[in-house]
Amino acid sequence: MKISYFFVASLSYVSVARASQSFEERCTDFRDSINSLPNVQATIVEYVAGSQNVSLPDNDPSCNQSSQFVTADICRAAMVVKTSNSSQIVMEAWFPRNYTGRFLATGNGGFGGCIRYPELDYTTRLGFAAVATNNGHNGTSAEAFLNSPEVLRDFADRSIHTAAKVGKELTKRFYAEGFRKSYYLGCSTGGRQGFKSVQQYPHDFDGVVAGAPAVHEVNLISWAGHIYEITGNKSEETYLPPALWNIVHSEVMRQCDGLDGAQDNLIEDPDLCHPTFENIMCPSDNKSNNGSLSCITEAQANTVIQLMSPYYNTDGSMLFPGMQPGSETVSSALLYTGVPTPYAKEWFRYVVYNDTNWDPTTFNIKDAQAALKQNPFNIQTWEGDLSRFQNAGGKIITYHGMQDFLVSSFNSREYYKHVHETMGLAPDQLDEFYRYFRISGMAHCYYGDGASYIGGSAPSAYSDDPEDNVLMAMVEWVEKGIAPEFIRGTKLDQDGHPQYTRKHCRYPRRNVYRGPGSYLDENAWECVL
């Protein structure tokens, strides 16, 4: 979508008007300015005083959010932006009173039809003018993509690009000083959206923070379909019930927890962990565990090994890496359930085949090949040449939890390797614009058993200091040229009190416990190559 703007002649008048208005007046008078943009129609323009809840009656029920607590004083603007004759995005722009001269766009999650209101609140609290969208459809299902290529295009890349263009223009109209720098913050699908911006729209953002990025998107979905091929249903000998996954996890941790020098129930570097399962297998004279929950059979051991192994195409190329060890208990509850994953079922029904009757239990390598060949709007997001973004002066910080139970952290390693090989840059050269941090004890995007509070999203925000907050670390890198050597994470107890901190290393460095003293002391750890 092309957006043209016709406001230069009235710019001086607008500047005078802004200077003479209060923040509240400027907000309530902003509707006409929004509506003057091509293909944009305001639906809500309101001043919201901080420290109150805002009701969200139009938010899709599947988004599971009916209100949002707003921390800072903001001008809230909701609007519909037409992206084609058959598609549109719902977008919100929040303009804080405590504006710091920075613009920011946030991403989505899953199939991405939910505005991330917590991120809007989090970033406006930090002084960003922030925008977010529904990614072109409402709710968490992919059903909106059925026979709707323009809606799918919004999901693939156009929604964030449109939000950046419209959001930047509105920011310049709302604040006399405009904005100095532009940023992006997202995780999972939002991480993929960040890299899509880097690859396809290198001038949209000065700094991109992309957590647990779902790049290799098509192959990630096929891997999700492949899981059922491996586990089978609950009646098959290949299936493991949750209790057996607990045994598997305990064995993984027994073998791998101490590889980093500390017995802390965390795996710092899953690349070093190659567990075997002879010690928990049932006696060799039993082909079945007869319902025992104390040992696994040979068939079940093969299931575990396959899930931890890469998924290959028939030509020997890797489609997607296996799941990293250490994530077994949560992954078993969400992915290894003995039924096909909804993620794969919906994508193949509503995108690949446009057939609502497609049976996900029949998934095989031919389906993965069909999906990869289709790759609509290059949603794979696997371009290895990031030179346009680099030449534009952009910076990337990506992070991935080593306990991620949905998107294997090995995927971020593989993408880093792909960029390294494509651009022919050594890690120290990549460090000039692209840094990857492995976060031990972080699950998918946030939470987990370790020092996972790094400020990559609203749920993981604890401190605003650049050393403790990945978003503010990006600001310091872009605006002061100070690149982060580490990202400090904080472990909180159940009452929200800090237990310990840990400095998470930039890849390819790994964390090793050197002592002396407790592993709870961040200075007892060292980043080594």
Swiss-Prot record:
GO biological process terms on file: xylan catabolic process
Enzyme Commission code: 3.1.1.73
MF GO annotations: feruloyl esterase activity; metal ion binding
Binding site for Ca(2+): 257, 260, 262, 264, 266
The name this protein goes by in its record: Probable feruloyl esterase B-1
Catalytic activity: feruloyl-polysaccharide + H2O = ferulate + polysaccharide
Biological source species: Aspergillus terreus (strain NIH 2624 / FGSC A1156)
Annotated signal peptide: 1-19
Stored InterPro entries: AB_hydrolase_fold, Tannase/feruloyl_esterase
Catalytic residues identified in the record: 188, 404, 444
Family per similarity comment: Belongs to the tannase family.
Record: glycosylation sites: 53, 64, 85, 98, 138, 233, 286, 290, 354
Record gene name: faeB-1
Purpose: Involved in degradation of plant cell walls. Hydrolyzes the feruloyl-arabinose ester bond in arabinoxylans as well as the feruloyl-galactose and feruloyl-arabinose ester bonds in pectin.
